[in-house]
Structure formats: C-alpha cells, structure tokens
Amino acid sequence: QNWAKFKEKHIRSTSSIDCNTIMDKAIYIVGGKCKERNTFIISSEDNVKAICSGVSPDRKELSTTSFKLNTCIRDSITPRPCPYHPSPDNNKICVKCEKQLPVHFVGIGKC
C-alpha cells in the first residue's frame, strides 16, 4: 500500500461519517467480503504525514499527539451491504512509515 491508498482508506476532513455507506465502497471489500473494521482519522493530511517526518529507516511509528478517530465496526456477517456502527475515539495512532510517509494503519494507542 502507498500514501495515496492510505489517504483514501483512512483520512477524512469531517467526523460525519456514514459507516454503512462508506464501508460498501470497493476499497473496503476484501475477498468479496465486507471488511471487519476500518479506522478513519479525522484530520488534515499534513498532520497525519507529520507522524512520519524524519522517521528513518522505514518502521512503525506512534504519533506524539492524539487524533480524533472514528472506527466503523461490522455488526454481523451478512451479504453486502453489511451493517456497521461507528465507534468514536480520541487517541494516539500507530502507522507504518515508508519514505517518511504513512502507508499502513497499524493500531490505536500503541504500536
């Protein structure tokens, strides 16, 4: 995965996320099945990129500040469209950095 895909999958400028609509997009369908969960970072691209600024070599990095988050969690295994519910949070995030850019969302709160 690269920075462009990471942005598309995880960064949003607004916290008003309709999980049921957004999670039915092709990028969240894995092997023909609905993805179990996806975390959205409510922030500017520059703030998220800053996590990897100066990080060398490529590695996982924990943000020094907390981000507003919204995780869409699948309620049940059903045919598409799958039902999801939002789980808001405010926490540090761990991302995988490559060439000083976030390319993979690792987790919330720790690496």
UniProtKB/Swiss-Prot annotation:
Gene3D superfamilies: Ribonuclease A-like domain (3.10.130.10)
SMART domains (UniProt xref): RNAse_Pc
Family listed: Belongs to the pancreatic ribonuclease family.
Keywords from the named record: Disulfide bond, Endonuclease, Hydrolase, Lyase, Nuclease, Pyrrolidone carboxylic acid, Secreted
Cellular compartments annotated: Secreted
Protein name: Ribonuclease, liver
Main localization of the protein described in the UniProt heading: secreted
Record-level GO cellular component terms: extracellular region
